[in-house]
Amino acid sequence: MKKNITKTIIASTVIAAGLLTQTNDAKAFFSYEGKGLEIAKNLADQAKKDDERIDKLMKESDKNQTPYKAETVNDLYLIVKKLSQGDVKKAVVRIKDGGPRDYYTFDLTRPLEENRKNIKVVKNGEIDSIYWD
């Protein structure tokens, strides 16, 4: 009788250890999956905010019949991306009265680099022209 109880206790311990290992692996997997979903949600929220902001800027310019204005390079990039049609890979934006630094070049096949997003646009930020490539 003691042998059966000992075997049962050992078997239960082995099974419990296996279940514990599996649940820890599952917790680790689901925690990474949860973080991935959270990051994706944050990116989607940020894209939605950017889109709403650009829509507001463009509607305001259309209403006042003035050239599009941008405060940062990120705004320029989003305006150009929204105005692009077809298979456009590059765009060069010229700012009105910007002097020697009045051109901004964007690769539309990739997202804008983080270090360029918050750079202020020269002068008042009015777009003079956009060249598509």
UniProtKB/Swiss-Prot annotation:
One of its GO terms (cellular component) is extracellular region. Residues 1-28 form the signal peptide. Keywords: Secreted, Signal, Virulence. Transmembrane segments: none annotated. It comes from the Bacteria. InterPro entries: FLIPR (IPR023256), FLIPR/CHIP_sf (IPR038529), FLIPR/CHIPS (IPR023253). It is found in: Secreted. May be involved in countering the first line of host defense mechanisms. Impairs the leukocyte response to FPRL1 agonists by binding directly to host FPRL1. Belongs to the CHIPS/FLIPr family. This is FPRL1 inhibitory protein. It comes from Staphylococcus aureus (strain bovine RF122 / ET3-1). The gene is flr.
